[in-house]
């Protein structure tokens, strides 16, 4: 299948909501799939040393202007360029779902973290209210250019399977929080009704993504 061409804005999201998950004392940070480097540039402004890997050549070129080091290529292509036991934090903001074998990749990257280093990630939640609504009532699963049903996503996750991804691959989850809660007039009431009927057991459906901080075991 031919590569799906993304709009330029796809690579330029600063993801400011993820800054809260970066430890304050972290000094050296690697972002995998940095796009144009907007998120890591915010960390650089705080005095952090910022490294990145980005497969898109144009985005990597832009990111290199504001970050300390940027390697253009995939994880497998550039893993050997990264020093072992070097990073306080590795970040993947909505990247894991684009990987064909994410469990292998997070295991490979573990050696690049310092002893007390953490892996910070944002991963889309396939149980988001909009998705459930479309499957149940529109009886459809329609891929799109972005968001949860992005046509370039290889893997789909729930809150439970996100935790399992980390716990079964050499990490312990330190923190997990839903982010980007639905504000839609159509889907917020649906999520509320679902939780009323099921005694608040479906709170995960409110969130588009889950942010996770995982420490290597």
Describe the predicted segments one by one.
Residues 145-161:
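Acceptor-substrate binding/catalytic loop of class I
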Residues 1-85, 89-91, 103-106, 160, ...:
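Conserved N-terminal segment of class I S-adenosyl-L-methionine
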Residues 93-98:
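Short catalytic micro-motifs in class I SAM-dependent methyltransferases
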Residues 100-104, 131:
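Short N-terminal helix/helix-N-cap motif within the alpha/beta-hydrolase-1
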Residues 50, 119-120:
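A short hydrophobic/small-residue beta-strand
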Residues 104-118:
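A short glycine-rich, Lys/Arg-flanked "PGG" loop and its adjoining helix->strand segment in the class I
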Residues 120-142:
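Conserved class I S-adenosyl-L-methionine
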Residues 160-177:
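A SAM-dependent methyltransferase catalytic signature shared across enzymes that methylate proteins
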